Amino acid sequence: MSFATLRPAPPGRYLYPEVSPLSEDEDRGSDSSGSDEKPCRVHAARCGLQGARRRAGGRRAGGGGPGGRPGREPRQRHTANARERDRTNSVNTAFTALRTLIPTEPADRKLSKIETLRLASSYISHLGNVLLAGEACGDGQPCHSGPAFFHAARAGSPPPPPPPPPARDGENTQPKQICTFCLSNQRKLSKDRDRKTAIRS
């Protein structure tokens, strides 16, 4: 009578049919890698499904680009450039309109932006002195016949000091301040007088 020796089957074979124990090499590799995965191997179909889910989740979290913001920086740069171009065009248009209001000789004289602002300030002061002097100024130089416009027009400011008496001959006097627009008016008046004199003669 002979007896057959039966080997007991591993318990995991019946409890977990889809899980097979790792070999010694795989077990060592998992220990050396430092991962938290369990020392078992899941069925191939289940692994593929979980890997696809991980990749899809990574794409959603990452947004398809570095930092999760694809194309946002170029759009912001284009918007900033367009805003700067609009601002520059507005400034240039305003300076062009201001330039047309300032009389110069010659009329088509090229002016920089700082020259345009300075001449505009001088022209406003000159027009204010023209209004203050009125017809009392016959020499075409209202800026030298009375107080400066910015002193008279400033609200709450004390009255300007009286003009100094005319200097005598031989006394050292400071050079007169020249207004460009007064000088231009004086030249026009001189030309008109010469023309009238030539017509009469």
From Swiss-Prot:
Q: Can you supply one Gene Ontology CC term for this chain's record?
A: chromatin
Q: Which SUPFAM superfamilies does the record match to this protein?
A: HLH, helix-loop-helix DNA-binding domain
Q: Name one GO biological process term.
A: tendon formation
The protein's job, in short, is: Plays an early essential role in mesoderm formation, as well as a later role in formation of somite-derived chondrogenic lineages.
Spans of biased composition, class Gly residues? 59-69
> Where does the protein end up?
Nucleus
Locate the region Disordered: 1-92, 148-177
Q: How does it assemble?
A: Efficient DNA binding requires dimerization with another bHLH protein. Dimerizes and binds the E-box consensus sequence with E12.
Q: Which UniProt keywords apply?
A: Activator, Developmental protein, DNA-binding, Nucleus, Transcription, Transcription regulation
- DNA repair as a keyword? no
Annotated InterPro entries: bHLH_dom, E-box_TF_Regulators, HLH_DNA-bd_sf
Biased-composition ranges for Basic and acidic residues? Answer: 70-88
Gene Ontology molecular function terms on file: bHLH transcription factor binding; DNA binding; DNA-binding transcription activator activity, RNA polymerase II-specific; DNA-binding transcription factor activity, RNA polymerase II-specific; E-box binding; protein dimerization activity; RNA polymerase II transcription regulatory region sequence-specific DNA binding; sequence-specific DNA binding
Q: Which residues form the bHLH domain?
A: 75-127
Which stretches are tagged as biased composition: Pro residues?
157-167
Name by which UniProt lists this protein: Basic helix-loop-helix transcription factor scleraxis
